[in-house]
């Protein structure tokens, strides 16, 4: 769903044009709601979009990927009542927490021209806002707002996006446009003054928690969600995403062993064919039917030719539209189950290690070698390192986090890419993300960072993985062979497609990795460490320069 709201009704024409520029399958399902308070244009979807217009105010409901009503008066469905400022009527509405999925509610007062926004713990639809000379604008994407009023490019955000892969909340690529924080009540006055307060705070890490108990809680939450999905679709079949990662394997094997949900595994190969090959192997072992869907190879070339920048949100939204069209053609699939965000919840945010590196650089004054990240290489200087560290601090503050909280504090920024999956314009099936529930969000904060670092991710998914947690694909091993030939001269035997941790080839990889590590450490005069015992091919960023010397 795409939507743009403006408190200035004269913007209706340009808003319509801006919405039409987004490549959606059915732009004809556009909904326009106008009044004395302004205008709102939204594309139709199974995401609920409701507008309750009265003499005193307008109440808009955004979100709920379950395809049901997102708000019901006095229904008592959710245990998280919406809060609001005194005098508002938001407290009469409750978020539909049927699957503990996110929602947001917007209230516009016609008399005071103020806006109240209530955001859930996990923003299923990202909401961005801009205030310009008394005009308040909201949208589901910063790119949508950027085309209506003049904007200036935020160079710091661009550097952060290119070097870290995301932009810290509440910043965007545009200086004037900000992202709304989760679990907050935000009031925007008619003069542009913004006030916000938190209605939920994440728990602090439980240093005394038993890891086995945390794992059992994780299993209980996921299984409970799968059973609720099954009960929502009695006698109907669905689809489970299956990629190269452990998360989707865990979801598939749990559903099979616990005999919940009738489903077909689906692999969406939007880029590399490695996930498709991994999914095919896992599906064969699990005896699950698999459908692989690949995007045309020239898609991104056409996207760039059409003027859509890769570092914005257009590519992500286009991926979502492609996935929606493809999944909509699956016969008999009434719902989709995915496994986004598990990495951040069980292993800490993917950016935490990089931020630790740039903080160290900022303190030492020594520049890092180029940071190899998509879509290009960035020179990390002490100035950039200090800027990134400052942005992380701002992001934590805007999200109400403290240094004692888990590194998941920047989860809102990190999941913009995942939420692009939810931003597609049309959908004829329900989408469920069992990892994106309030129960698991709280669990992720309770897990100490030391545990996330020490405990291998495969541990959280036992005993459901059944020996499939340590496999490596042949195509991945070809890349590893080239690396070790450069570093050690030791070639890897290419025996079979799947490598188990107990096999001789895996042990040979460990020996080769340790040999390369020792030799490069001695050559550079400082210790080089591995990312983990179960990843012998992956060396840390500090070895990039050393590996170049081995070519």
Name the predicted role of every residue range.
Residues 96, 173, 399, 405-406:
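Alpha-helix-centered segments that form part of catalytic cores
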Residues 476, 480-484:
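Small-residue-rich helix-loop
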Residues 153-155, 467-476:
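Short, surface-exposed acidic
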Residues 502-551:
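Acidic, carboxylate-rich catalytic segments that either coordinate divalent cations
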Residues 408-420:
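Core structural elements
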Residues 1-298:
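Cysteine-centered catalytic environments shared across enzyme families
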Residues 9-13, 114, 124, 190, ...:
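ATP-dependent adenylate-handling active sites, centered on carboxylate activation for C-N bond formation
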Residues 74-86, 484-503, 509-510:
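Charged, glycine/proline-rich intrinsically disordered loops and linkers
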């Amino acid at each position: 769903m795409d939507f743009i709201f403006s408190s200035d009704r004269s913007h209706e024409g340009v808003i319509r044009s801006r919405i039409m520029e987004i490549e959606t399958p059915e732009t004809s399902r556009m909904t326009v709601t106008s009044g004395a308070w302004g205008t709102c244009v939204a594309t139709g979807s199974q995401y609920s979009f409701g507008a309750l217009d009265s003499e005193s105010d307008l109440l808009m409901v955004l979100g709920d990927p379950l395809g049901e009503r997102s708000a019901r008066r006095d229904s008592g469905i959710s245990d998280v009542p919406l809060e609001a400022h005194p005098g508002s009527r938001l407290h009469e509405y409750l978020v539909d927490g049927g699957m503990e999925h996110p929602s947001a509610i917007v209230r516009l007062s016609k008399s005071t021209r103020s806006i109240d926004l209530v955001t859930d713990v996990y923003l299923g639809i990202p909401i961005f806002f801009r205030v310009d000379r008394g005009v308040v604008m909201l949208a589901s994407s910063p790119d949508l707002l950027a085309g209506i009023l003049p904007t200036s490019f935020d160079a710091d955000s661009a550097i952060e996006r290119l070097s870290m892969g995301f932009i810290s909340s509440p910043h965007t690529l545009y200086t004037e446009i900000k992202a709304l924080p989760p679990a907050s009540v935000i009031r925007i006055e008619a003069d542009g003054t913004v006030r916000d307060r938190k209605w939920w705070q994440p728990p602090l890490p439980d240093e005394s928690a038993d890891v086995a108990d945390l794992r059992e809680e994780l299993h209980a939450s996921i299984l409970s969600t799968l059973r609720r999905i099954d009960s929502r679709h009695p006698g109907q079949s669905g689809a489970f995403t299956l990629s190269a990662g452990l998360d989707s394997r865990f979801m598939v094997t749990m559903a099979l062993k616990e005999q919940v949900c009738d489903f077909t595994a689906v692999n969406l190969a939007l880029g590399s064919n490695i996930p498709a090959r991994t999914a095919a192997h896992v599906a064969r072992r699990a005896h699950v039917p698999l459908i692989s869907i690949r995007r045309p190879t020239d898609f991104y070339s056409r996207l760039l030719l059409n003027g859509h920048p890769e570092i914005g949100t257009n590519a992500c939204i286009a991926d979502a539209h492609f996935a929606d069209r493809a999944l909509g053609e699956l016969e008999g699939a009434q719902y989709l189950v995915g496994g986004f965000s598990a990495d951040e919840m069980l292993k800490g945010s993917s950016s935490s290690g990089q931020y630790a590196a740039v903080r160290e650089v900022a303190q030492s004054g020594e520049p890092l070698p180029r940071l190899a990240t998509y879509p290009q290489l960035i020179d990390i200087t002490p100035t950039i390192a200090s800027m990134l560290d400052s942005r992380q601090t701002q992001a934590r503050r805007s999200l109400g986090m403290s240094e004692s909280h888990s590194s998941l504090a920047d989860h809102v920024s990190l999941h913009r890419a995942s939420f692009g999956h939810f931003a597609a314009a049309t959908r004829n099936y329900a989408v469920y993300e069992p990892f994106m529930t309030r129960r698991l969000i709280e669990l992720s904060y309770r897990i100490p960072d030391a545990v996330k670092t020490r405990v291998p991710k495969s541990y959280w998914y036992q005993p459901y993985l059944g020996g499939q947690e340590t496999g490596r694909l042949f195509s991945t091993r070809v890349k590893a062979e080239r690396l070790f030939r450069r570093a050690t001269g030791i070639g890897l035997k290419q025996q079979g497609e799947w490598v188990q941790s107990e096999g001789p080839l895996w042990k040979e990889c460990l020996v080769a990795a340790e040999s390369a590590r020792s030799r490069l450490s001695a050559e550079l005069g400082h210790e080089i460490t591995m990312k983990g015992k179960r990843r012998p091919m992956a060396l840390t960023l500090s070895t990039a320069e050393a590996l170049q010397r081995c070519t």
